[in-house]
Amino acid sequence: MEFVTTETVPGREITESLGVARGNTVKARNVGRDITQSIRNITGGELKAYSELLTDARDDALDRMAEDARSMGADAVVNVRLESSEIANGGSEVIAYGTAVTLA
């Protein structure tokens, strides 16, 4: 499954647009990590535990978007976008979406 952030797949012809493919996930922070990350926030530097959490969430959202696109019979997803938001109790939601297409 190919993902692109552009409207077309370079070197390929889109034969059909199948609709929106999407995938999302919600990840919660760990209380123990919050304590160590709070200290890092005071002293400065990357909050690695949070970076890893968001990387995992993005990967999961993209995997779920790919599953959704495959279920529609897609070869690729164009115009891929990722959005994230904080939800209750320190959880983070990441959604991936784009247009599922078939290619010649």
Swiss-Prot record:
Gene3D superfamilies in alphabetical order: Hypothetical protein apc22750. Chain B
InterPro entries: UPF0145_dom_sf, UPF0145_YbjQ-like
Matching SUPFAM superfamilies: YbjQ-like
HAMAP family the record matches: UPF0145 (MF_00338)
Family to which this protein belongs: Belongs to the UPF0145 family.
Protein name: UPF0145 protein VNG_2432C
Organism: Halobacterium salinarum (strain ATCC 700922 / JCM 11081 / NRC-1)
